[in-house]
A protein has these predicted regions:
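Leucine-rich repeat
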Residues: 2-201, 210, 310, ...
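A structural signal for leucine-rich repeat
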Residues: 96-101, 121-127, 144-153, 169-178, ...
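Conserved hydrophobic position(s) of the canonical leucine-rich repeat
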Residues: 46, 78, 107, 129-132, ...
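C-terminal capping region of solenoid repeat domains
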Residues: 1-4, 249-251, 264, 289-292, ...
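Short, aliphatic-rich beta-strand segments
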Residues: 49-53, 81, 263-266, 316-320
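Hydrophobic alpha-helix feature that most strongly marks membrane-spanning transmembrane helices
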Residues: 283-286, 293, 320-323, 337, ...
Length: 389
């Protein structure tokens, strides 16, 4: 490579270089300072700070690095501020200093992962936050965030918490008036009353219970504009969805109220998921267009008595993951192909690891009658990268 090619990158405007460096972890961005005098201070113009404790030898070294970066960074606006300390404890005064500095620079996206998290008062009313991820792995400490949250611009909220901090998570959710995407993962909580969340702006919802044996009282979500839903089936009992009164249907036998707006549904496999519960979900989502499911762990196939409305009118794509090629898998797939009238694509991810078994499944399904004449079948597995009918 000639010298002109080498200089082409170095001669770019500082604004362009800072955007490039902002796309990489901050530790790597700082390392570019040794390339030449031209590069020595380019990293100080980054608009994203992304620091993970893992590459450092000890939490104290990582904390010192964060201090140094914030002292030298010249950007007046931080688009992304991400700190990942796993379950390690960071001194409260130090964490408060970092968060306040990010807020001073009008942080847009904030992600924090640590063992014990105490938020400064200034965080509760941040007007620039649009995306927030909080992961608190502490299981022994109880933190009570007393001050109400008011995050007027927050549209994406991702929470991972254990035990009592779940109550704090609920306080946080209620302080986001324009929330569009919510992901909530936690073990369980104790509360005498059911918790009700009215979020008319919500479009995407993901609910995961980390441990199935922990008690969890009922959660009710009033979400009239929901489009995407991802659940593990541990939520069948303690979870309800409601819409505005004009859209609420009577409770069906399924795990959800009938939710006419959902277009994307993803179901994770666990001890509660079975073929019957899958179709209960489908019955609840009449406008469903895209379905992703993992194979139930143990369940005998029982053909539904009626075909869900979404399969007759709207269901366009199906992703079936962890397929073992067993009898119940084949019966389910044949049923979907034979009854989904507007299906365009079904993608099957095989997990058997046996070439002969996977190829037999492929051959059988390619010969299976399809109600939708435009439906294609894609296979993904060790025996083939993909095969499309």
């Amino acid at each position: 490579m000639g010298s002109k090619d080498v200089d082409r990158l170095s001669n770019m405007p500082n604004e362009v270089l800072s955007e490039i460096l902002s796309l990489m972890p901050t530790k790597l961005a700082v390392r570019t300072s040794i390339l030449s005098k031209r590069w020595r201070y380019n990293w100080t113009l980054v608009t994203s700070i992304d620091i993970d404790v893992l590459p450092f030898h000890g939490v104290e070294n990582c904390c010192a690095f964060v201090d140094r970066v914030l002292d030298l960074c010249k950007s007046t606006e931080i688009k992304l501020f991400r700190l990942r300390f796993s379950n390690l404890w960071v001194q409260e005064s130090r964490m408060t200093k970092w968060i306040n500095e990010a807020l001073r620079r009008k942080v847009g996206e904030f992600e924090i992962q640590c063992g014990l998290l105490e938020l400064p008062i200034s965080f509760y009313t941040c007007k620039t936050l649009t995306k927030l991820r909080v992961e608190n792995e502490c299981q022994n400490e109880f933190m009570d965030w007393q001050t109400p949250f008011n995050l007027p611009c927050l549209k994406t909220l991702d929470i991972v918490v254990y035990r009592h901090p779940s109550l704090n998570a609920f306080k946080l959710i209620r302080g986001c008036p324009v929330l569009e995407s919510l992901s909530l993962q936690f073990t369980g909580y104790n509360n005498d009353n059911e918790d009700i969340f009215s979020i008319p702006t919500l479009k995407r919802l993901k609910l995961i219970r980390k441990l199935k044996w922990r008690s969890c009282n009922k959660l009710v979500f009033i979400v009239p504009n929901l489009e995407d839903l991802c659940l593990d089936s541990r939520w069948c009992s303690p979870f309800e969805m409601e819409e505005l009164p004009s859209l609420v249907s009577e409770l069906s036998d399924g795990p959800l109220r009938k939710v006419v707006t959902i277009k994307h549904l993803e179901l994770k496999s666990d001890d509660y998921l079975c073929w019957e519960s899958i179709f209960q979900y489908l019955e609840s989502c009449s406008q469903l267009e895209h379905l992703t499911i993992e194979k139930p762990r143990e369940s005998d196939w029982i053909e539904p008595q009626t075909v869900p409305t979404c399969m007759l009118m709207n269901l366009k794509t199906i992703k079936f993951e962890n397929c073992m090629g067993e009898k119940d898998d084949i019966q389910f797939l044949e049923y979907m192909l034979g009854n989904a009238e507007v299906l365009k694509r079904i993608t099957i991810t095989c997990k058997s690891g046996l070439m002969e078994k996977e190829l037999q499944l492929c051959a059988r399904l390619l010969k299976c009658p399809r109600t939708s004449k435009y439906c294609e079948i894609n296979f993904v597995g060790k025996s083939f990268d993909s095969a499309t009918s």
